Amino acid sequence: MRKKASPKRPKQKRLSPNDRRKEFVAKATEFFSEEGFGGGTRDLARRLGVTQPLLYRYFPSKDDLIKEVYRTVYLEPFDTGWEKLLTDRSRPIRDRLQDFYEAYTKVIFTRKWLRIYLYSGLKGLDINRWYVGVVRDKILSRIIRECRHEAGLPVHSKPTASELELAWVFHSGIFYYGVRKYIYESPVLEDKEKMISNALDAFLAGFERVFGTELPVGHAPMKAVG
């Protein structure tokens, strides 16, 4: 009786070095989000389905791979025009902030993004310190400057510690909505846009109230409700 020929395995597509590197970063992102940063490169290579020497050809150390994950997951989204959106004074500040936080939360409100961020904080890695600096300099400082401009205050001096703390309270409240929903799986207001809108009303009114003593006499207050 004639034996059936075993089916041929489909040939695996040979990846270019750049595509292979991207694949490693994508799989490492999944690995770090599920397992944290405690494992060694041997476990990581096994999870990626490659040998340790091959992984080392692309990333000489685990720290190098972590830095690349940080760059692709946390820094690349800032190249999408967010900074221009925040500083476009042809539009009311409230509209700009609403649009920004809707776009921003579409990126960070994923289980993967949040887990990596929280794991890195527990492990004491630099990712959190780097990202906190990015948020402070590229987001919160700009928001404070735009709030000052809207209120008729000087915009060229650095944000004060009090201004930054108020901005952090506002920003962190939105961030923690994502933690409650995607990490704790707790009930939240499902209308995310409404949550952002409510937070903006409180922040803009609070900024006006806390720092309004510095306003020029007769200046119209910022509009909280759009």
Regions flagged by a language model, labelled:
Residues M1-D19, L85, F211-G226:
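N-terminal intrinsically disordered/low-complexity leader segments
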Residues R20, K62, V69, V73-Y74, ...:
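Hydrophobic/aromatic residues within well-ordered alpha-helical segments
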Residues E23, K27, F31-E68:
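Helix-turn-helix
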Residues A26, R94-F109, L114-Y119, L164, ...:
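Amphipathic alpha-helical segments that line or abut small-molecule/effector binding pockets
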Residues V69-D99:
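Amphipathic alpha-helical linker/stalk segments
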Residues E83, D88-R89, D95, K106-I144, ...:
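Short secondary-structure transition hinges
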Residues D126-L153, E165-W168, S197, D201:
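Amphipathic alpha-helical packing segments from all-alpha helical-bundle domains
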Residues L140, H156-I183, D191-G206:
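Hydrophobic alpha-helical segments that form the core
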